[in-house]
């Protein structure tokens, strides 16, 4: 994540948006269960909201500096932070009741790696487990914000098929203006 993007994702304005609009929209009518995995929390503003809603939360961040900072800030809470690559998760099969991806999928640098990550999430979710997330629709402003950064926008029109190919069932994708939310489950 480049520095300009990181400043936005760590800002009080983004924190307010995440808490009042983004997470309530993505998680509306979703049961996350008792053991939740968050992939790509960045500076952790989504983690701050999510940890108040679930008993146990594990956050996986590929950026070592961000993972270390978040782990230090959330030490002693119900959150475990790991520096790890979500395309090769260090967890047992079926360990989590739910997994979340909040505005991070576009940072995975290739469609093949995005699909590998989705398959890994399928692997670590229990039967009946939920995958829920959101990402932005590609716009010139978003492309500019990601200058000198990994940026591979996901086409919401193809995401349900990609989730099915990864082993998920019942995928839904809803576009709202410049963003979309998605959800799918692991077959029981």
Predicted regions and their residues:
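Class I SAM-dependent methyltransferase SAM/SAH-binding core
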Residues: 37, 42-88
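Short catalytic micro-motifs in class I SAM-dependent methyltransferases
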Residues: 103-107
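A conserved beta-strand element that flanks and buttresses the S-adenosyl-L-methionine
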Residues: 100
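N-terminal, positively charged/glycine-rich alpha-helical extensions of SAM-dependent methyltransferases
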Residues: 1-6
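A short glycine-rich, Lys/Arg-flanked "PGG" loop and its adjoining helix->strand segment in the class I
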Residues: 115-127
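C-terminal alpha-helical "lid/dimerization" subdomain adjacent to the S-adenosyl-L-methionine
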Residues: 9-10, 14-15, 130-183
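Conserved alpha-helix/loop element of class I SAM-dependent methyltransferases that forms part
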Residues: 14-34
């Amino acid at each position: 994540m480049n520095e300009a993007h990181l400043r936005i994702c760590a800002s009080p304005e983004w924190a307010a948006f995440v808490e009042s609009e983004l997470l309530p929209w993505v998680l509306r009518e979703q049961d996350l269960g008792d053991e939740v995995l968050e992939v790509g929390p960045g500076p952790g503003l989504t983690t701050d909201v999510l940890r108040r809603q679930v008993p146990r939360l594990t956050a996986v961040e590929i950026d070592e500096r961000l993972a270390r900072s978040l782990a230090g800030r959330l030490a002693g809470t119900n959150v475990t932070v790991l520096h790890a690559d979500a395309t090769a998760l260090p967890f047992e099969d079926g360990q989590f009741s739910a997994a979340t991806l909040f505005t991070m999928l576009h940072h995975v640098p290739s469609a093949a790696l995005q699909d590998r990550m989705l398959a890994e999430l399928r692997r670590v979710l229990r039967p009946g487990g939920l995958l829920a997330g959101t990402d932005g629709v590609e716009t010139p402003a978003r492309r500019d914000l990601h200058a000198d950064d990994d940026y591979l926008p996901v086409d919401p029109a193809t995401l349900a098929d990609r989730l099915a190919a990864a082993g998920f069932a019942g995928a839904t994708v809803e576009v709202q203006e410049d963003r979309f939310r998605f959800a799918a489950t692991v077959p029981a």
